[in-house]
UniProtKB/Swiss-Prot annotation:
EC number: 6.5.1.3
Gene name tied to this protein: RlnA
Variation of activity with pH: Optimum pH is between 7.5 and 8.0.
UniProt enzyme class: ligase
Cross-referenced InterPro entries: T4-Rnl1-like_N (IPR019039)
GO molecular function: ATP binding; ligase activity; metal ion binding
Source organism of this protein record: Bacteriophage TS2126
Name under which the protein is recorded: RNA ligase 1
Length: 395
């Protein structure tokens, strides 16, 4: 196995020795941005909880992305992906880095990004073990791995690592149709993304640096001799159902995301808030377009839309009926309040629309005013209409 040339003109390199356990624990003690997870068996995992350009500029910080140590002697057992960025972000390689490759005619390698849950496989005392970015015993990723990987694939993975003396980490992405992130997959699967040298930090790509492993799925890395980041970003911008692509030289990585992925990511961060904003501004058609390919989310949007339509219809019907009855306002308000209680957190929206209809005013606008409030987002969240991204943090 041999590595590619390291990325040029970048201010930081993932090559070289990993941060020591002492340095990792020091960072965890001095900032709340890092956490230490222990498994009770002598292993410690250090990872970031959130990050900023300033934080990731600290020495060793980009390596603390789920790195696993043996606490007794500080040995690094597993070295996962370092933190890397989208093209255009402050710490990502810029145009000058790509130009250096074009000028020297050294290839870069491009692969479609697998959109699942990142996992790492490593050997400890000859035993194959798995971890996620946040846990040595990941409940979600562990369950998905057991579901997607058969014994033959597990054995092949163990042999692949053992053949290299156990000083490599296998970097994996786990996907499952029952736990989608953004891109929907038809069946469970585990994809081998790369191997990483624990001691030296460089990466080996399947099909580029070592033969494609039998019984294992893998990403396909395609060489590009004349890679232009701006042209490439334009090529993929309008792709639907694809999160994006990753470009590497075997040391540094850069992400290129599609417009669809950025829009969907915004929705997944706050589905209730984004839905209510689109509903109140009559932009549901745009939202539906942004969710193309995610039938589960489209069904959730339809359910939420039907729920609000039913709520509004009942409120206006009640207000109109009270007006026709000729009830005084105080009595009408009392009846509206009694009925509104059935709608839980949406009671204010019901009451305001009903009273606007009772008074012959703009019931729709009154209804939308309430939907723009934070309390409406909480009320919609309580209905559990929108599926959540899997129960573990990602990053």
């Amino acid at each position: 196995m041999s590595s590619l040339a390291p990325w040029r003109t970048t201010s930081w390199s993932p090559l070289g020795s990993p941060p020591s356990l002492e340095d990792a624990l020091r960072l965890a003690r001095t900032t709340r941005a890092f956490a230490v997870r222990r498994d009770g068996e002598g292993r410690a995992l250090v990872t970031y909880l959130y990050g900023t350009p300033e934080l990731f500029s600290l020495p060793g910080a980009r390596e603390l992305r789920g790195i696993v140590y043996r606490e007794e002697d500080g040995t690094v057992l597993s070295r996962p992906f370092h933190k890397f960025f989208n093209f255009g972000e402050p710490l990502a390689p810029g145009e000058e880095a790509f130009k250096a490759f074009r000028d020297s005619m050294v290839p870069l390698f491009v692969a479609e990004k697998v959109d699942g849950y990142l996992a790492q496989a490593y050997l400890d005392g000859g035993e194959l073990r798995f971890a996620s970015r946040h846990s040595l015993n990941p409940p979600l990723v562990g369950a998905l791995l057991r579901k997607a990987v058969d014994e033959e694939a597990m054995a092949r993975l163990g042999k692949l690592l053992a053949a290299e003396g156990g000083r490599w980490t296998a970097l994996l992405e786990v996907v499952d149709p029952e736990a989608p992130v953004m891109v929907p997959y038809q069946e469970p699967g585990v994809y081998l993304l790369a191997l990483r040298s624990i001691g030296e930090g460089h990466y080996l790509l399947p099909g580029v640096h070592f033969p494609l492993p039998e019984a294992l799925r893998y990403v396909r890395w395609e060489p590009r001799m004349d890679f232009d980041p701006h042209r490439f970003r334009g090529e993929i911008r309008d792709l639907q159902g694809v999160e994006g692509y990753v470009v590497t030289d075997g040391a540094e990585f850069v992400k290129f995301k599609t417009g669809w992925a950025f829009r969907l990511a915004r929705f997944l961060m706050d589905p209730e808030g984004v839905f209510l904003e689109a509903y109140a501004e009559d932009r549901l058609d745009d939202l539906v377009g942004a969710l193309a390919g995610r039938e589960d989310l489209l069904r959730a949007v339809a359910r939420a839309q039907d729920y609000l339509a039913g709520l509004y219809g009942e409120a206006v019907g009640a207000g109109d009926a009270l007006r026709r009855m000729g009830l005084p306002r105080k009595e009408a308000w009392a009846r509206v309040q009694e009925e509104a209680g059935r709608w839980g957190g949406f009671a204010p929206a019901y009451a305001r629309a009903a009273m606007a209809a009772y008074e012959g005013g703009e019931a729709r606008e009154a209804f939308l005013v309430e939907l723009r409030k934070r309390s409406a987002r909480k009320a919609l969240e309580a209905l559990h209409l929108f599926p959540r991204v899997g129960g573990e943090l990602r990053g």
